[in-house]
Amino acid sequence: MGIGMDSSTMSGPLVAHSGILDGDYEKRPAVCKMQMRFDLANVGLRVLSLACSLVALVSMASNQESGVVTVFGFKLPVYSKWSYSDSFEFLVGASAAAAAHSLLQLLLCGMKMVKRASTIPSRNHAWLLFAGDQVFAYGMLAAASAAAGVTNLNRTGFRHSDLPNFCKPLHRFCDKAAISIVFAFISSLILGGSAVLDVFWLSKN
């Protein structure tokens, strides 16, 4: 007497997971395609986040300039440096931390893809990534907002005198600060996108 068994009704440890957790690409080509798209999106966001964080970091950490301004007929030397502002120091620190986070996750993703495994091996890992991406996203947003909202740059940026418009004699300093702030905002958005991608993965597993 033959006994028939419907594999679709089976449950337990012998049944393959229906989500995208498993990295067994050869046996499940449909899952492979979806998994590959997710992994490429994950790696792409990590690369962009790393690049933007590094631009924000380098632009600000190398930002200093000296010049001469004329006040009431007197020429006064002025000098500005990023470390004179607490907000700029915060931005440098946040950018360095975000860059380190992005680099670490990028390396881990690369190692997983070389082994043809999912870049997120478990739900616990996904939750950890989600928390980390959120922390760094809000950190970069706060740092960029603080740097953009600085109103007391005359005191922190000048050694010799208070001037109402220090960007006129030190335009290069202001331009580099603006570049750093813009890329910090972009990095924050990208890290937020990574957090959304983490949620997508969790919803599928």
Curated annotation (Swiss-Prot):
GO cellular component, one term: plasma membrane
Subcellular location: Cell membrane
UniProt keyword terms in alphabetical order: Cell membrane, Glycoprotein, Membrane, Transmembrane, Transmembrane helix
Cytoplasmic-side segments: 1-39, 111-125, 198-205
InterPro entries: CASP/CASPL, CASP_dom
Glycosylated residues, chain numbering: 154
Annotated TM spans: 40-60, 90-110, 126-146, 177-197
UniProt topological domain (Extracellular) ranges: 61-89, 147-176
Membrane topology value: Multi-pass membrane protein
Subunit and interaction comment: Homodimer and heterodimers.
Family according to the record: Belongs to the Casparian strip membrane proteins (CASP) family.
Name this protein carries in UniProt: CASP-like protein 3A1
Taxonomic source organism: Picea sitchensis (Sitka spruce)
